[in-house]
Every structure is written in structure tokens, then in C-alpha cells.
Amino acid sequence: YSSAASDVYKRQVTQMLWVNLIMDTFAALALASLPPDERVMRDPPRKTTDHIITRPMGRDILGVGILFVAFLFGLLQYFKHADITSLTQFSVSGYLGSYLDFSSPEHALTPYELSLFFTVFVLLQFWNMFNAKAFNTHRSAFARMGASIGGFGLVALLILAGQYLIVTFGGKMFNVVPLSWTDWGLILAGTSIVLWIGEFIRMLGSPNHKS
């Protein structure tokens, strides 16, 4: 496993710069551009002893982080033991079967597999940005989207366009190769489960549902 992991790390220096840009700069710009919500004025003042990261926020950050790491670790293990040229070959049984298989890989991770891994990683963060938008609002992530289309929506589009351009044209600079349109569609649809799970949880916690 260590040889496969080191191969990934050596290839991901410029990729991680892009990921940091997404998670820090772009995400901050997207969330800061959201229109003001009058409901904030109904909340009681926060105590001076309150932490910036509340317990619910910390629980969500830790929980999502653990799930992402667990899934991506399994994906890396799967790619290590399977020769994947398209996600249409993906097998749940193969994914689960290779999860704890620490034997030496039969082949090195291919540039295509590494490009798939990189894109899955980025789009998991992309969809989770929508969950961050709706955090503690008890509303859908799509609520008031029309009012934030020029800010949040524009940044979201910039992230998607940037990821496509990097993977398609980044070449040796980003250690990537172009993905097929089929794989782009599968990654977009598959990683979006992060958003839909968040929507389901928010629906269960909404005042209307509780009543």
C-alpha cells in the first residue's frame, strides 16, 4: 500500500494546490457572497465564551471528514488491485473485497486512475460546499439560490469549469489525463450523494417535518 500511496502523493503537489484553492479561497468567497438572512436577527446574542466552531459544526466536520477518508481510502485500494479504464467497470463487490487487501499491487496506479481519484476527491468537496451553505438553516441547499446565483452560483460554476480544464488540458503539469464524458457524468452523479444525504437530513430536521 505504501508504494501506491507514495505514487499518489508524488503526483499530487499541483493538484493539492488546486484543492486548497477550492476549499479555502473559493469556498470562502462562495459562502461570503450569500445574501443576508433576516432570520439571523432573531437569534440570541452569542456568549463571549462560545467557540467559533460549535459542537454541531464540529460533529459535522468530523463525521464528513471520516466518511470521505474512508471512502477515498477504499477507492485507492480498489484502483490498486483493479485495472480501471472507465468507471463503468466499477464493482461494489470488488471495492469491498479490496478494501483491506494490503498485498502488493499487481500494477502501478495508471494516470487515468489517478485522474479519476483526483476528480472524485474534488467533486466530493464541491457538493459538500452546498451542505455548508445550508448548515444550521433548516432549509434546502437550493433555497434562495436565485438570489445567490451571481455569487455562490458563479463560484460553483468556476470550480466545475476549473476542474474540467485542469483534467482535460493540465497534462504533465497536474499529472492528469483527460476523462471520458461518461466518467464525468458518473462522477458528478455519484459524488452528488453527499448533497442528497445532506438534503435528507435537513428535511428530517426542519420545523415543518417535526410538526
Regions found by a protein language model. Give the residues of each.
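Single conserved hydrophobic/aromatic residue that forms the stacking wall/gate
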Residues: 1-5, 9
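Membrane-interfacial helical/loop segments at transmembrane boundaries in membrane proteins
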Residues: 83-108, 178
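Transmembrane alpha-helical segments that form the membrane-embedded catalytic/substrate-channel core
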Residues: 21-29, 33, 122-135, 160-164, ...
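Juxtamembrane helix-loop transition segments at the membrane interface in multi-pass membrane proteins
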Residues: 30-46, 132-139, 210
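Transmembrane helix-loop junctions at the membrane interface of multipass transporters and ion channels
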Residues: 6-7, 77, 163-180
